[in-house]
Regions:
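Interaction-mediating elements
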Residues: 7-117
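Short, Lys/Arg-enriched N-terminal segments with co-localized hydrophobic residues
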Residues: 1-7
Length: 117
């Protein structure tokens, strides 16, 4: 691999809830993803789309998270702490949260002008 163990975790949080302190939530979820993937927070990218038009069974708040990384994903171990984080920080119940995990091939992810593989 070109960049050693840098795996560039990415998380995209879409929610129908309105988030007051977006920067704080982005920093905290970056720290969480860094911890769960065992990667430096320096390489975690986080995106937040709040107050989105979303519907999941009814009009109560819901959340959809996309998590991508070159390796370092363990969905069965990561799902619960991520759902708990969303519940604690935003108040969305676990049964109103979907998470999509994607292990991206190193040849399909680039940073700093070059792919990782």
């Amino acid at each position: 691999r070109l960049f050693g163990c840098i795996n560039m975790p990415y998380i995209n949080v879409s929610t129908s809830a309105k988030i007051e302190d977006k920067k704080k939530l982005l920093e905290e979820i970056s720290i969480l993803l860094s911890s769960l993937t065992n990667k430096s927070k320096r390489f975690v990218m986080a995106k937040l789309d709040d107050n989105s038009e979303m519907y999941f069974d009814d009009e109560s708040p819901c959340c959809y998270l996309e998590i991508k990384s070159i390796g370092s994903l363990n969905p069965s171990e990561m799902a619960k702490p991520i759902c708990n984080f969303i519940y604690e920080k935003i108040g969305i119940p676990l049964d109103k949260i979907y998470i999509s995990f994607e292990d991206v091939p190193a040849t399909m992810w680039a940073w700093n002008g070059r792919t990782f593989g």
